[in-house]
Regions:
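Conserved NAD+-utilizing ADP-ribose enzyme module
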Residues: 2-5, 13-38, 60-62, 71-162
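Short, well-structured hydrophobic secondary-structure segments
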Residues: 39-74
Length: 162
């Protein structure tokens, strides 16, 4: 199988059920969050293009988002998912072939999205530069998450701890 990476993904429980039923989870344009204008859609399309350029085949689908570098926390989920946690989400812990994992800097990605929204007026640093998966949290995009890779699924609390 080659080199593997340990990753975590936050997914709605409906997508976890899809993963269990179909044996894999792939990105779908219908699951890309909506935004004012088309900023998020353009960002996801740019990520798909960057993945293809890096040799990660996407078949034209948006990525499955994951995290590497260190285990994720409930606080990470609250920060990244926000209010929709109340509708039922889980953390999927899995390993994936390194060749299918495109890791990039999340801060630079957010700067890029902010520019797509036109809120910064600043040209962001290159966000699509491959980033090593070390000990710091890094975003990882994959074309697929296979059920065979899953180590554990942890349901997330539906509200913030008191």
């Amino acid at each position: 199988m080659g080199a593997i990476v340990e990753l975590w993904s936050f997914q709605p429980l409906t997508r976890v059920a899809e993963l269990e039923a179909r044996g894999e989870l792939v990105g779908s344009w219908e699951h890309v969050p909506s935004s004012t204008g088309d900023a998020i859609d353009r960002g996801y399309r740019a990520m798909t293009t960057a993945m293809e350029r890096a040799g990660v085949p996407t078949n034209g689908r948006p990525p499955v988002w994951a995290w590497g570098g260190r285990p994720v926390t409930v606080a990470d989920a609250e920060s990244l998912v926000g209010e929709s946690l109340r509708h039922g989400w889980a953390t999927i812990e899995f390993t994936a072939p390194a060749a299918l994992a495109m890791a990039t800097d999340y801060g630079a990605w957010n700067d890029y999205l902010a520019e797509l929204f036109g809120t910064t007026g600043v040209v962001p640093a290159a966000w699509d530069v491959p980033t090593p998966i070390g000990r710091e949290l890094v975003q990882v995009c994959l074309p697929v998450l296979r059920a065979a890779w899953v180590r554990q699924v942890h349901p997330l609390p539906r509200s913030a701890p008191a």
